[in-house]
Swiss-Prot record:
Induction: Expressed in the early phase of the viral replicative cycle.
Function: Plays a role in virus cell tropism, and may be required for efficient virus replication in macrophages.
UniProt family annotation: Belongs to the asfivirus MGF 360 family.
Pfam families: ASFV_360
Entry protein name: Protein MGF 360-8L
Keywords annotated in UniProt: Early protein
TM helices/strands, residue ranges: none
Protein origin, superkingdom: Viruses
GO biological process: taxis
Claim: Cell membrane is one of the keywords in the record: no
Length: 319
């Protein structure tokens, strides 16, 4: 059960306190990264005031790991009292004092890389992906990540796309993997986290959105002009995985060469994509004879999803 003092601090952190009273918050320990600690009214998230996540929500578990890396004892105690999970704390504690505090608060001793990685990635959530990143990123307390140890998990999720993440630096591979998982499972907070943290990987985000059929993120990238890729190359990526109807259609509407797409699908032996591309070719050549389900020139991802959610490829087109 939370103490009265802990509950009071939590209640105050959920209020909007005028700047002239910030000294009181600092005195009460509601202070972190030179700003008042703000909590979401309806969830267990900290509202960050520092860049690059200004105004964004960060789960208490992730915020706790950040505080542990900073050796901020008061904030570590505070977040743990508020319900943050200290389980992984010892993996990030950089001093003996911080390690001892984490032990007292219930952190698990002796965790290895594989246990941490597998435990967090078992459930694909924004919180788990960001937490996994924060634990391993710039962490001298852990051994260097071994790609081979986690190879089975990575290959299962990325399939052929795994060849695009090869790098001489293991951490770069894992960052790309976490980013890809965020896009694949449409985890908006995690996508934004990696976009803000790794601005140089915007092309990777685009490639993941296309390959994993995330037309919503693809549309956002295209509308905001975050990064540019040749439209026919985008279509080739979309055709690499079968049933990628959403991103294939989006690339088609943007002007990708549908004949080239048909060739690519044949090369990959993706029959369902092939039938779909042939239907799109019919739509382009003669709207009247095309399948009634398909409509031309739609770029709204919600409308594309609604249009194609019941689409079933047929073998009516000759190969």
């Amino acid at each position: 059960m939370l103490s009265l003092q802990t509950l009071a601090k939590k209640a105050v952190a959920k209020q909007s306190v005028p700047e002239e009273y910030h000294y009181i918050l600092k005195y009460c320990g509601l202070w972190w990264q030179n700003k008042p600690i703000s909590l979401c009214h309806y969830c267990n998230y900290v509202i960050l005031s520092s860049t690059p996540f200004k105004g964004e929500l960060l789960h208490l578990d992730v915020a706790l790991i950040m505080a542990i890396k900073e050796n901020n004892y008061d904030v570590i105690r505070l977040f743990t009292e508020w319900g943050a999970n200290i389980y992984y704390g010892l993996t990030c504690a950089r001093t003996e004092q911080t390690q001892e505090l984490c032990r007292k608060l219930g952190a698990k001793d002796g965790l290895n890389n594989k246990e941490i990685f597998a435990g967090l990635m078992r459930h694909k959530t924004s919180n788990n992906i960001i937490l996994c990143h924060e634990i391993f990123d710039k962490n001298p307390m852990l051994e260097a990540l071994n790609v081979q140890e986690m190879g089975e998990e990575i290959h299962r999720e990325l399939k052929l796309f795994i060849f695009y993440i090869l790098d001489n630096v293991p951490m770069n591979i894992f960052v790309k993997y976490w980013y890809a998982i965020a896009v694949k499972y449409k985890l908006k907070r995690a996508i934004f986290f990696f976009y803000q943290t790794y601005g140089h990987l915007s092309m990777w985000r685009l490639m993941c959105a296309i390959y994993f059929n995330n037309v919503f993120d693809l549309h956002e990238i295209y509308e905001q002009k975050i990064v540019h890729m040749d439209i026919d190359k985008m279509m080739q990526l979309a055709c690499m995985q079968d049933y990628n109807f959403l991103t294939i259609y989006y690339c088609f509407v943007l002007g990708a060469d549908i004949d080239q797409a048909i060739t690519v699908t044949q090369w990959h032996y993706h029959t369902n994509n092939l039938y779909f591309c042939k239907d799109l070719k019919d739509l382009k050549q003669n709207t009247l004879t095309a399948r009634p389900l398909l409509l031309p020139n739609i770029t709204d991802p919600k409308k594309i999803y609604t249009m194609l959610k019941n689409y079933l490829p047929t073998s009516s087109n000759s190969l």
